[in-house]
Amino acid sequence: MIDRYKHQQLRIGLVSPQQISAWANKTLPNGEIVGEVTKPYTFHYKTNKPEKDGLFCERIFGPIKSGICACGNYRVIGDKKEDSKFCEQCGVEFVDSRIRRYQMGYIKLACPVTHVWYLKRLPSYIANLLDKPLKELEGLVYCDFSFARPIAKKPTFLRLRGSFEYEIQSWKYSIPLFFTTQGFDTFRNREISTGAGAIREQLADLDLRLIIDYSLVEWKELGEEGPAGNEWEDRKVGRRKDFLVRRMELAKHFIRTNIEPEWMVLCLLPVLPPELRPIIQIDGGKLMSSDINELYRRVIYRNNTLIDLLTTSRSTPGELVMCQEKLVQEAVDTLLDNGIRGQPMRDGHNKVYKSFSDVIEGKEGRFRETLLGKRVDYSGRSVIVVGPSLSLHRCGLPREIAIELFQTFLIRGLIRQHFASNIGVAKSKIREKEPIVWEILQEVMQGHPVLLNRAPTLHRLGIQAFQPILVEGRAICLHPLVCKGFNADFDGDQMAVHVPLSLEAQAEARLLMFSHMNLLSSAIGDPISVPTQDMLIGLYVLTSGNRRGICANRYNPSNRKNHKNEKIYNNNYKYTKEPFFCNSYDAIGAYRQKRINLDSPLWLRWRLDQRVIASREAPIEVHYESLGTHHEIYGYYLIVKSIKKEILCIYIRTTVGHISLYREIEEAIQGFCRACSYGT
């Protein structure tokens, strides 16, 4: 549908029988109206042509071949010179065959049928509006009992039957005579209603505004009563109040959307376009049909049987008619939602038929598979892995994916730079993956962002833009800081990559969708680019050194025991003197040369003008040297003093991991300060 703002949208809801017939009906030049499917047949077994008025009828749903009618006549589509748009012999319209994807038909039901979604699904909307138990309504719909509708204040059939034992003795003689009168069946049908027709009558008699008013008054009365002191009664009152709120909201929705409650009971059953329930011929001449066709055939068979009982056989017992109405109701239920009433219907191979609900719901349903999650051009999908060396706004794209996504741009680049004379030569170079191809591909990718999406896309940060770079392997590399926005981790998650084609899409990606432009949560405003997953583990490993300071494992070798009753593994344990480094570059160089480990403690020279925060005043040890200098050793730092007790230098106890982390933080702060200075 198109709303008043010209936005395309899809709305699922109830429609009137008039709207259903308007969707399907077509008027032929001879005045005949077609659109109703009356026969349960599909194709003729000899001619392989659709049966007239059947489930694939060309008069109702349009021609199988564009511009060719059932007779074989051909006319140019859209030719204004042609007077008639319909074939005079077969009544098929000369239009494009794609009309069979959206042209609907309908089945005129011989009896009203409740829509099983609004009756059996929880909460039951019909039971909510009528304020009646669901079991009672189900018994009424499936003809287990009847609904009384007395037409006068005088004693009627139902009143007489209900008060038979309480009236005077003379009624015992008059009632049997009354039951055997000639017009009793007509009188009974006038007073007794059963099946979905009874539900439709009750829904049609509803005044939605009165429902809202009465429900509101009752809700206020229950609220004024207060707690009764009985837990069971208080829960019962609470459930009733919740029910009244739901009933008022439902009634307001019907009023706001101009939907009549009786539309929940079907008189016309829409028939899907044929292309949405196809019959396909496979190898060997066998036909493979959609389950929807078989369920439609079952509805038509039972509906036609009911029509015959009502029209041709005047003396049909009422119980037989009620039984056939129940069969029609069950057939429509199976078509709409197979298995909702218990055991699902199965075919001859014990396979459950896929109903309309099964076709549209779930991950493989019509909406999620072919509309929301359909495959599009210029897109790919792969597993994500961590890219620790990437910038926040970059992503690593595998060569195999990149060369396919940017193939069109790559061909244009090869031709423009005269590396290929035409498209064929360019494609040949791409297939052979010549070195020049990768150079041109890198140039193309530098100015073209890509969009990464992880399903389900629950908020706008589920799709973000990145600057792609080529990486080896077959996995997409992602910066770990952007994982929280995607709700992704690196345990096998997959992400889709899309290439924005138009200039508007590329500009929007660069200005609004780049990952470094989306650092805050759009819901609560908190930072969303925070360390998670692998980054937390990496930070822990980087900074996990010996946290107990110089005292650890130095004076108490028994600390190396795993248990008090176990022996020391290394009885020759000796304290290893930590190395001294003048600057962080020497320490990192020693780590790269594998002279020290990432978490090995070391002494790093500290600047005298920088303050060291001490946790204790007295030194743990004091080492004196022959020249008179001495070293005062504290928990996490060391001070070298002269004979005159002047501070010569300070060393702090740290690890290569801490040094690497602090250098990264320092570079980030300096870069931020430079950016701010450029901005001012």
Curated annotation (Swiss-Prot):
It is found in: Plastid, Chloroplast. Its cofactor is Mg(2+); Zn(2+). Gene3D superfamilies: 1.10.40.90, 2.40.40.20, RNA polymerase II, clamp domain, RNA polymerase Rpb1, domain 3. Pfam families: RNA_pol_Rpb1_1, RNA_pol_Rpb1_2. One of its GO terms (biological process) is DNA-templated transcription. SMART domains: RPOLA_N (SM00663). Belongs to the RNA polymerase beta' chain family. RpoC1 subfamily. This is DNA-directed RNA polymerase subunit beta'. It comes from Cucumis sativus.
